[in-house]
């Protein structure tokens, strides 16, 4: 690695949580499955909806409102609500069901075990530096049991 400027001592360290401290892919897959199961429970008449349908709703919403991509929770919630209305559900009911489905997603999304190696690293770094978590996602540091390391 080449440094073109003198490297000064660190004053703090920031982490993007997803795929840095743990493998996020399987976590999101499980969370999406939990959301699908909740939708099936709450709206059985709709049946099991292809995950590609929800991805298309997200892409459509991002085209209409590119800024929504910066709030992934809102983006997912609004895309589910939009998808449900397109499938024939009334707006009010779609909003309520989307909220409950997103809640299932969020709970499952935060239901993971951060590897011991990440805990050890964070503990050692937190003893020397202020640590900051940066994410555009919706991981809950308390539910992940890593909030004690961050400011």
Stretches with model-predicted labels:
Residues 2-56:
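Active-site neighborhood of HAD-like aspartate-dependent phosphohydrolases
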Residues 13, 97-111, 118-150:
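Substrate-recognition element of Asp-dependent hydrolases with the DxDx(T/V) motif
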Residues 24, 28, 72, 76, ...:
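Hydrophobic (often cysteine-bearing) scaffold residues that line and stabilize catalytic clefts
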Residues 30, 34-37, 82, 86, ...:
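Residue-level signal for well-ordered alpha-helical scaffold segments within enzymatic catalytic domains
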Residues 31-39, 54-58, 76, 80, ...:
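Hydrophobic alpha-helical core bundles mediating ligand binding, dimerization, or RNAP-core interactions
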Residues 40-46, 86-93, 148-149:
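Short helix-capping segments at alpha-helix termini
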Residues 46, 62-66, 140-147:
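Short, flexible, glycine-rich and Lys/Arg-enriched loop motifs at helix boundaries
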Residues 56-103:
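A metal-dependent, Asp-based hydrolase signature
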């Amino acid at each position: 690695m080449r440094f073109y400027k003198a490297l000064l001592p660190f004053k703090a360290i920031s982490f993007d949580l997803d795929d840095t401290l743990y493998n996020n892919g399987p976590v999101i897959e499980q969370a999406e499955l939990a959301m699908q199961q909740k939708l099936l429970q709450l709206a059985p008449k709709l049946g099991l909806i292809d995950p590609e349908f929800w991805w298309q709703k997200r892409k459509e919403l991002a085209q209409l409102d590119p800024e929504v991509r910066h709030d992934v929770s809102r983006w997912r919630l609004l895309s589910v609500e939009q998808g449900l209305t397109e499938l024939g559900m009334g707006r009010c009911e779609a909003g309520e069901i989307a909220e409950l489905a997103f809640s299932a997603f969020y709970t499952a999304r935060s239901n993971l075990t951060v590897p011991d190696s990440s805990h050890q690293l964070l503990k050692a770094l937190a003893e020397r530096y202020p640590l900051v978590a940066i994410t555009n996602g919706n991981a809950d540091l308390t539910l992940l049991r890593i909030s004690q390391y961050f400011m």
